[in-house]
A protein has these predicted regions:
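Right-hand nucleic-acid polymerase module
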Residues: 1-86, 94-215
Length: 215
């Protein structure tokens, strides 16, 4: 007798993304925001997003970025619970020590364009809990829609890459040309605060789950 199976494709897609992004190689989890997510158009947002990531690629990999070498990342666009607040979640493999990559990435986004949010409003930290962070980043994939903006800005290198070979004086100079020591110092304070808040949120969710389990 033939059995009928009802497959929840939305959940399957979301689960698969979470599985991929829970890989320990994705050392950074981030959210990039705009000053007015409700006002910015998709075309403008996409252009800013792509240009930003290309600039990051050029900063860390120099001319190799023009040959297809870049920061490996998956990006997901989201509009918020009310559907009127465009922003982007991402998971990335940091090409340098993740903590300092977070500082640099946040500073560069905050001053990239007049419509990109100040660094205190973005959220870029080293990945703290792989399963939780991947689930949060891909939560809108459950809607089973085609994310053209996120896909276009995402990047995977064609071949395995040893990023340490790019950690040299030339890379350091490119970073210094884009981000000042003062900006890094201020960014560290923000990253430290966001790491602490992320840990607190994880703890609070765990406590709530424990309470529900005892009821």
């Amino acid at each position: 007798m033939q059995q009928n199976y009802k497959i929840n494709w939305q959940q399957c897609v979301s689960d698969k993304w979470q599985e991929v992004l829970a890989d320990e190689a994705y050392t950074v989890t981030g959210t990039l925001k705009f000053n007015k997510g409700a006002a910015i158009g998709r075309t403008t947002a996409s252009k800013i997003l792509n240009a930003y990531w290309h600039k990051l690629d050029r900063t860390f990999f120099g001319h190799a970025a023009n040959k297809g070498i870049g920061i490996e990342r998956w990006i997901f666009s989201e509009y918020g619970s009310a559907g009127d607040n465009l922003h982007f979640h991402f998971k990335a493999k940091a090409p340098i020590e993740p903590y300092y990559f977070c500082c640099i990435a946040n500073v560069m986004w905050s001053k990239f364009h007049r419509q990109t949010a100040r660094n205190i409003y973005n959220w870029i930290t080293p990945t703290i809990l792989k399963a939780n962070s991947s689930g949060y980043s891909v939560k809108d994939t459950r809607h089973f829609t085609y994310d053209a903006m996120g896909l276009e800005a995402s990047h995977q290198n064609k071949h395995a890459l040893d990023t340490t070979t790019f950690q040299n004086a030339a890379q350091a100079q490119r970073i210094i040309n884009k981000v000042s020591i003062e900006e890094i110092t201020k960014a560290r304070q923000i990253v430290d605060l966001q790491i602490e808040e992320t840990i607190q949120r994880i703890y609070q969710r765990q406590r709530k789950a424990e309470v529900r389990g005892t009821q």
